[in-house]
Amino acid sequence: MAGGAVVSTGAGKDYPGKLTLFVFFTCVVAATGGLIFGYDIGISGGVTSMDPFLRKFFPEVYRKKQMADKNNQYCKYDNQLLQTFTSSLYLAALVSSFFAATVTRVLGRKWSMFAGGLTFLIGAALNGAAENVAMLIVGRILLGVGVGFANQSVPVYLSEMAPARLRGMLNIGFQLMITIGILAAELINYGTAKIKAGWGWRVSLALAAVPAAIITLGSLFLPDTPNSLIDRGHPEAAERMLRRIRGSDVDVSEEYADLVAASEESKLVQHPWRNILRRKYRAQLTMAICIPFFQQLTGINVIMFYAPVLFDTLGFKSDASLMSAVITGLVNVFATLVSIFTVDRLGRRKLFLQGGAQMVVCQVVVGTLIAVKFGTSGIGDIPKGYAAVVVLFICMYVAGFAWSWGPLGWLVPSEIFPLEIRPAGQSINVSVNMLFTFVIAQAFLTMLCHMKFGLFYFFAGWVVIMTVFIALFLPETKNVPIEEMVLVWKSHWFWRRFIGDHDVHVGANHVSNNKLQP
C-alpha cells in the first residue's frame, strides 16, 4: 500500500482513507480516457498545416498558403470547411454527452468509458483511410462521440474513487493524460510531416487508434465506484469496494452510511434534469455552465488546436512551426504536473487566480509583439530572436493555463454535485465545454483574419472577467468530501441565500426527514 492519510474535511467530518495501490492504478487506467481527447486536440492543427493533406482535401487553402508571402498572413488559413474538419468533433461530443449521462447512471461509469473508447477507435480507422472530406467529417463525428462519453464519465469516476484529501491530485490525472496526448500527437506530426511520399497525415490520424485501444481495453478491468454500485442497487458490493479502495484496516462505516443516504435521496428525484434547476442547486448549475464557458474563452485551444498553423502564420517555416508546437506541448505536460502536486495544498482558488493573472500578461505581450511586426496589414516577417520571444511568452501563457484553468476546469465541476444530480450536472459541464470548443474551433481562423493581433487582447479581456468571477463566486473546495459540499455553498457570502436551512445536511440521519420534490 501507498502512504495512508486521514481525510480532514474542514466541513465537519473526517473520513479515514488511504491512497492504496488499488486506487492509484485504477485511477491511472481511468485517466487514460484523457489521452483520446488530448491526441485529437494535438493532431488536428499539425495535420491541417501539412501540404499533402491540404492538396488532397482543401486545395483552396493550399493555394492561399503558397501565395501567403505576398498576401495577408492573418488570412491564409481562413476557410470554413477546414474549420469544420476541426470543429465537427466537438459538436458531436456535445450531443453525445447527454446520452452518456444516461449510460453512466444506468450501466456505470466504466461502460461509458468503454463506449467512448470503442467509438473513438472506429473513427480513427475511418479518418486514417479517408479519401474525401465526407469521410473525414464522419470520422471526426465518431471521434466526437467517443470524446463526449469519456469526458462525461472519467472525471466523475476519479472524483468518486479518490479519498477527499487526494481528490484533486488524482482527478488532475485526467488533465495530465490530455496533455500527454497532445504532446504525443505533436511529436507524431513532427515525424510524419517528414515522410516524403505525402501520406504522413494518414499515419497521424490513424494512430489515434492507439489511445482509443488503451481506454477501451483498460475500462474492461476497472471496478465500479461505490457510489455507482449503491445507486444501481448493489449495496453489499459497494461496501466491499469502499473497504477495498480505502484500505482493509480502515473503518468505512460512516462514509458508507453517508453514501447510502445520498443514494436514497437521489432516488427520490425522478427528474434530475428538472431537479438541477431548483433554487438550492443554483450555485452548482452556475459553475457547471460558467467554468467550461470561461475555460474555452481563455483562448487555449487557439494554441492547442492550431499551434502549427498559428506559428506558420507568424512566419515560422514548416519544421519550426511543428517543433514550436512540440515545445508548447512539453510545457503543458510539466505545468500540469505542478498542478497535481499543489492543488490539494494550495487549493483551487489560488491556482485559478495566479494562472489567470499570468495568462492576461502573456496574451497582452504576445498580441503587442505580433502587432509591432505585422500591424493590421498582415504583411511582414519575423526575425529568429523576435520569434523566440513570442514562443517564450506563448509557453508562459500555456503554463499558466496548465496549472489552473486546464485541470481545474474539469476538477471543480466534477466534485461539486450531489449524487442526485451528478450525471446531469457533469453532462451540462461537458456539453457547455464542447459547445464553446466547437465555436472557437469553427471561428478562430476567421477571427484571426478579421481581428488580427487584437484577437489576443480579446481573449485577455475574457481572462480578466473570469478571474474576477472566481475571486467573487467560487469558494474553496479542497479536502471536502463530495457529499458534504453543500456546507461549503451554505457558508459562501453569495450562494447561501439560495440554500435553505432544511437543505443543509450531511449523512445518513437526513434522508428519512427530507423528501425531495420531483
From Swiss-Prot:
PROSITE patterns xref list: MFS, SUGAR_TRANSPORT_1, SUGAR_TRANSPORT_2
Membrane topology (UniProt): Multi-pass membrane protein
- Residue spans making up a coiled coil are none
Query: Cytoplasmic compartment: which residues?
Result: 1-18, 102-117, 162-167, 224-290, 344-351, 409-427, 474-518
Q: Name one Pfam family in it.
A: Sugar_tr
Which parts of the sequence lie on the Extracellular side of the lipid bilayer? 40-80, 139-140, 189-202, 312-322, 373-387, 449-452
Q: Which source organism does the UniProt entry give?
A: Oryza sativa subsp. japonica (Rice)
| Gene3D superfamilies linked to this entry | MFS general substrate transporter like domains
Gene this chain is encoded by: MST3
Gene Ontology cellular-component terms for this entry are: membrane
Which tissues express it? Highly expressed in roots. Expressed in xylem and sclerenchyma cells of roots. Expressed at low levels in leaves.
Question: Where does this polypeptide localize?
Answer: Membrane
**Family note:** Belongs to the major facilitator superfamily. Sugar transporter (TC 2.A.1.1) family.
Which keywords does this chain's UniProt record carry?
Membrane, Sugar transport, Symport, Transmembrane, Transmembrane helix, Transport
Q: What does this protein do?
A: Mediates active uptake of hexoses by sugar:proton symport. Can transport glucose, xylose and 3-O-methylglucose. May be involved in the accumulation of monosaccharides required for cell wall synthesis during root development.
- What are this entry's molecular-function GO terms? monosaccharide transmembrane transporter activity; symporter activity
TM stretches of this protein: 19-39, 81-101, 118-138, 141-161, 168-188, 203-223, 291-311, 323-343, 352-372, 388-408, 428-448, 453-473
Its lineage opens with: Eukaryota, Viridiplantae, Streptophyta, Embryophyta, Tracheophyta
Stated name of the protein: Sugar transport protein MST3
